């Protein structure tokens, strides 16, 4: 009877033949990619037109940003594997991404060029660099772990796993396709803040979706040792919050 009850419980947590957790990850990643590619579509134009970077300096910054974005998931995955767990890592990454994208929407004064001398708003640039750093860290924590959660939703050798990942990657493509058009159009038509703000709102929608739907992850994304996370490492600060602060 217990096996039958367990099977019935598992089936009640499915939708269209897949775990409901897949759709939670689908929409979370769709909105994360919406925000990521929406911001990326504007970045070079923002640097060269608003802050008057040269093309070379703009490409150099984007190259450094791209390199760090693809390097940080190694660290984010390791931290989640050893301490945080995938669920907490995705939430933390989502919060960083929301803050980073909304920070990008804060406009200062556009740069000016007089006699070949470029004057830039130093405070606006500081906010920009800090926001970019938040996005890099956010991607590092969210991207590798949400993909791993999808795999954990299926038992070993489950024939549905391949189609589940196909659906998941379809969400990535949908988010990337829509954002490049929408955020680019908003940025060019109404101002940079509108384009970056739309990317931030998209990520906020993804984070809200994940937080509300995390009950469908079937406990597969929890910390490996919850008690260790609650240990105090200095003063009242627990290991979990020490990780957040260190990031």
Language-model segments: which ranges?
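Cytoplasmic membrane-interface "Motif A"-like loop-to-helix N-cap segments
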Residues: 82-98, 158
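Intracellular loop-helix junctions on the cytosolic face of multi-pass helical membrane proteins
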Residues: 1-20, 156, 184-247
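Short amphipathic helix-loop junctions that connect adjacent transmembrane helices
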Residues: 41-61
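A gly/Pro-rich, aromatic-decorated transmembrane alpha-helix motif that marks the paired
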Residues: 40-41, 74-78, 106, 174-189
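Cytosolic juxtamembrane N-terminal segment immediately preceding the first transmembrane helix
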Residues: 1-33, 37, 112-126
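C-terminal ends and interior cores of transmembrane alpha-helices
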Residues: 92-123
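Cytoplasmic loop-to-transmembrane helix junctions
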Residues: 20, 24, 57-58, 92, ...
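Central cavity-lining transmembrane alpha-helices of secondary-active solute carriers
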Residues: 63-82, 98, 143, 177-179, ...
């Amino acid at each position: 009877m217990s096996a039958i009850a367990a099977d019935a419980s598992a089936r009640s947590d499915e939708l269209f033949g897949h775990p409901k957790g897949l759709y939670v990850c689908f929409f979370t990643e769709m909105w994360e990619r919406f925000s990521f590619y929406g911001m990326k579509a504007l970045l070079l134009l923002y640097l060269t037109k608003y802050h008057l970077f040269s093309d070379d300096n703009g490409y150099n910054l984007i190259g450094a940003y791209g390199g760090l974005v693809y390097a940080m998931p190694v660290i984010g995955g390791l931290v989640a594997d050893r301490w945080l767990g995938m669920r907490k890592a995705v939430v933390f990454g989502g919060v960083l991404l929301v803050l980073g994208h909304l920070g990008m929407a804060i406009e200062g004064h556009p740069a000016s060029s007089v006699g070949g001398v470029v004057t830039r708003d130093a405070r606006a640039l500081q906010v920009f660099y800090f926001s970019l750093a938040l996005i890099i860290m956010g991607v590092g924590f969210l991207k590798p772990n949400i993909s791993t959660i999808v795999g954990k939703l299926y038992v070993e050798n489950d024939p549905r796993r391949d189609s589940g990942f196909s659906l998941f990657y379809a969400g990535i493509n949908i988010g990337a396709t829509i954002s490049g058009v929408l955020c680019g159009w908003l940025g060019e038509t109404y101002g940079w803040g509108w384009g970056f703000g739309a990317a931030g709102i998209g990520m906020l929608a993804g984070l809200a979706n994940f937080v509300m739907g995390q009950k469908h992850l079937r406990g597969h994304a929890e910390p490996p040792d919850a008690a260790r996370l609650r240990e105090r490492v200095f003063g009242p600060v627990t290991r979990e919050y020490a990780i957040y602060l260190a990031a």
